[in-house]
């Protein structure tokens, strides 16, 4: 990068500049999400040859279970008695849960109790359906969830149906099953029917995001795209600059020295000018990450050509 000059001791072909972006200071803070906005740079960068992510501070404020993820509801149908059945969609509050609290929350919704531990609605058949998890407080067990009847109505319950092909209104739709609450519970099939007791196929995983993508659209289609997906259903944006593994507990700040970032410099096929950036965070399904009105910051290292 450095060559001897005739007048100055050293002439350099490339100038490196660091651009700090903190979403707290974006102009459109009241009308845009921190995970999807466009910024007009105060300085125009001319003859840019590369861009690279060099620092990131990301608060872990996004939820594993939420309406925006489409996994905050559970459809159940129970057949009981000689010829009776009941079906209902149950809504789980948005939030982050550990496995045991996740199962407790669902059970409390199925069977609400009063301050004395008595059923509020003993006449409702769902009060006798329970999820359980084979996991102790110190982490021992299989981590798998089961569902079945309990209590005085156990013998009258004939069949339980779990249907993850239905939306929050109880209607069948075509959303991928991997985006439903069934996958968080470890139930990987679209539907479970014909029995009154089921064991999950996989372990419970209420934490929804294992990684996120940082996308930077510089409005130049003149660079390499280092991220390639080998699966048809995996969505990758052409402007992905980094893949960020999520580590640590929720509601903490994730710093670049505490995370695993996969990132390659964006190399342009020829010098470009940059004055506008669209910044987005995607979850692993390719959806805009819902940050719950919190902000993040990062640093871009931009290399530009210098006229000698």
Question: What does each model-found stretch correspond to?
Answer:
Residues 1-308:
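The ATP-binding site of the protein kinase catalytic domain
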